[in-house]
């Protein structure tokens, strides 16, 4: 049985990990064994935070909508309930963007909601 020379594949594997660890501090970017652990942990954080990002942004949108609707005398929950009753199908992302960037349009929506609630 011929002997297996693994120099090329080992070097390629090490290079791949060390390339992924570029920019890390100290031995985390220089030493394969430590870089491998750092890259693995970075991947775990990335996986976790891709899911957390969705929650964080939804919370931000809700906070912005709440702040903007309170300026017009409505709480977030009353405002969202009024939106559903008025059959206005705008998602939280769009509403939050309007609350920050386009205040007159948001005010118009709030007025529609107020008339729906009053009726």
Swiss-Prot record:
GO cellular component, one term: ribonucleoprotein complex
Keywords per UniProt: Ribonucleoprotein, Ribosomal protein, RNA-binding, rRNA-binding
GO biological process, one term: ribosomal large subunit assembly
Alphabetized GO MF terms: rRNA binding; structural constituent of ribosome
Pfam family, one: Ribosomal_L20
Family: Belongs to the bacterial ribosomal protein bL20 family.
Known function: Binds directly to 23S ribosomal RNA and is necessary for the in vitro assembly process of the 50S ribosomal subunit. It is not involved in the protein synthesizing functions of that subunit.
UniProt-listed HAMAP family: Ribosomal_bL20
The protein's name in its UniProt record: Large ribosomal subunit protein bL20
């Amino acid at each position: 049985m011929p002997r297996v020379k693994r120099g090329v594949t080992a070097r390629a594997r090490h290079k791949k990990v060390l390339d992924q660890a570029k920019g890390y501090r100290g031995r985390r970017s220089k030493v394969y064994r430590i870089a491998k652990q750092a890259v693995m942990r970075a991947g775990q954080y990335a996986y976790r935070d891709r899911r957390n990002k969705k929650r964080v942004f939804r919370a931000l949108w809700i906070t912005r909508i709440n702040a903007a609707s309170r300026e017009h005398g409505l709480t977030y929950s009353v405002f969202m309930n009024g939106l559903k009753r008025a059959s206005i199908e705008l998602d939280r992302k769009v509403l939050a963007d309007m609350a920050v960037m386009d205040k007159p349009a948001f005010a118009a929506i709030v007025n529609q909601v107020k008339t729906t609630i009053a009726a």
